[in-house]
């Protein structure tokens, strides 16, 4: 009898909806980037469309790439036509953007883990290399080669800088975004904290640009404060909005960078020392909290690992699609597989077919929140293909936003109990047959 497997099917939106959405997003960000150049400043405008295309390539299968390239390019062209005339269109630049996006997406896929692309500083450095260094340098080189001008060095630097800033501002956000992140903001506290931090950061950044010397130093402190207060996704969103606001202010009023604001320094000459101490103090406390939390997590993991590993009954952490994530020795002995072998299997493959449907029904109730735990007797295949009985107890661990993370399963060997029940049942059947054959009546007197 063949072992069966079960996969969770997720209904995805129609691909056409993806392409239309990408085209609209590309249109909006292209419009913003081109608006910066309308002010006639020497500031290299932020260029977001390449980063949008790069993220879309990274997140979608290769068969979608032609449609993504077409929809994003149409969004760019529509924004250009809206602000300028059709004669100003330069399809060479659009083609270079596509080349950069393809190269960046391929590099990001090679350099970053798929499920959680930004887990540490090393991942961020690889992201910067794959999106904000190599593709912009390649694009700048192609611009100089294919569209030579009077000042190729200036064109190269402006192109590289605008692409790099856009990538660092937008790509982390695009790589991290998952639909279930939006569910977190059903928590009023997180929503309020995120909006309050955004409002404070934008307001103080605006005031810094208008009235303070070295405004970017103050903005760095504000962004560090935002990063400390908020989760990763919300922090990157604040970084993006702050960069867009500040760039718009600089494009509208170039004198913001040229004005020394000596009047403030004459009253507060020691202000630079405050700027030295604030980031240092913030990072000190952040690192202390990080080390303390890491120590606490390590101790908790050690206690849990020991409790699981030395348990007399089988225990396992099971993914939401049925894969065995972690198993203890008792379970491995019960099923006859090693831990490495079990990681390549699912519980659906090892479950007796007659028990699988009932088990999956309970799993669905657990995921939907109808029940918190369930237990049942079920049969498994062991390594030799024999059927073994187990008492299964399952509970679900959820993320803070309520999304399921993994199951905790306790699997107790009840083979001996089932054999005893079978022997007792056979014995009672024999006694009943003997009594019927001998004409013996049995009754109870109270």
Predicted segments with their positions:
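PAS-family sensory domains
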Residues: 286, 403-413
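Short aromatic-rich membrane-water interface segments that cap or initiate transmembrane helices
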Residues: 153-165, 265-271
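Short helix-perturbing small/polar motifs within transmembrane alpha-helices
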Residues: 4-45, 51-150, 170-238, 246-252, ...
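PAS/LOV-family and closely related PAS-like sensory domains
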Residues: 213-216, 228, 234, 238, ...
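Sensory coupling linkers of modular signal transduction proteins
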Residues: 171, 413-423
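Sensory-module boundary signal marking interfaces of small helical input modules
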Residues: 290, 297, 400, 414-417
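Cytosolic signal-transmission helices at domain junctions
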Residues: 122, 285-302, 429
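PAS/LOV and related PAS-like sensory modules
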Residues: 298-324, 329, 333-334, 420-445
């Amino acid at each position: 009898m063949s072992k069966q497997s079960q996969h969770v099917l997720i209904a995805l939106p129609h691909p056409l909806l993806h392409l239309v959405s990408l085209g609209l997003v590309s249109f909006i960000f292209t419009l913003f980037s081109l608006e910066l150049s309308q002010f006639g400043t020497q500031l290299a405008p932020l260029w977001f469309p390449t980063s949008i295309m790069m993220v879309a390539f990274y997140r979608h299968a290769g068969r979608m790439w032609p449609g993504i390239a077409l929809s994003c390019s149409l969004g760019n062209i529509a924004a250009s036509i809206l602000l300028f005339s059709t004669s100003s269109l330069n399809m060479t630049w659009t083609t270079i953007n596509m080349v950069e996006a393809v190269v960046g997406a391929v590099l990001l896929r090679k350099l970053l883990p798929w499920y959680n692309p930004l887990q540490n500083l090393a991942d961020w450095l690889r992201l910067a290399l794959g999106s904000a260094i190599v593709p912009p340098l390649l694009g700048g080189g192609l611009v100089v080669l294919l569209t030579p001008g009077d000042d190729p060095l200036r064109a190269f630097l402006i192109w590289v800088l605008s692409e790099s800033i856009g990538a660092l501002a937008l790509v982390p956000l695009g790589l991290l975004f998952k639909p279930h992140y939006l569910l977190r903001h059903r928590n009023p506290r997180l929503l309020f904290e995120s909006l309050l931090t955004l409002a404070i950061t934008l307001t103080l950044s605006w005031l810094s640009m208008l009235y303070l010397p070295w405004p970017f130093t103050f903005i760095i402190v504000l962004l560090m404060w935002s990063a400390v207060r908020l989760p990763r996704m919300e922090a990157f969103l604040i970084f993006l909005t702050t960069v867009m606001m500040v760039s718009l202010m600089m494009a509208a009023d170039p004198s913001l960078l040229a004005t020394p604001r000596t009047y403030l320094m004459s009253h507060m000459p020691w202000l630079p020392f405050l700027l030295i101490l604030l980031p240092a103090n913030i990072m000190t406390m952040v690192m202390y909290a990080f080390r303390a939390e890491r120590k606490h997590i390590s101790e908790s993991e050690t206690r849990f690992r020991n409790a699981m590993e030395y348990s007399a009954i089988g225990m396992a952490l099971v993914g939401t699609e049925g894969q065995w994530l972690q198993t203890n020795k008792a379970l491995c002995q019960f099923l006859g597989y090693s831990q490495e072998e079990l990681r390549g299997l699912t519980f659906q493959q090892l479950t007796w077919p007659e028990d699988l449907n009932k088990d999956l029904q309970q799993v669905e109730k657990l995921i939907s929140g109808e029940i918190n735990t369930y237990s049942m007797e079920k049969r498994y295949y062991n390594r030799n293909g024999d059927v073994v009985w187990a008492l299964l107890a399952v509970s679900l661990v959820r993320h803070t936003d309520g999304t399921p993370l993994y199951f905790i399963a306790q699997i107790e060997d009840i083979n001996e109990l089932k054999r005893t029940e079978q022997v007792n049942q056979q014995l009672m059947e024999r006694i009943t047959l003997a009594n019927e054959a001998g004409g013996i009546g049995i009754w109870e007197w109270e």
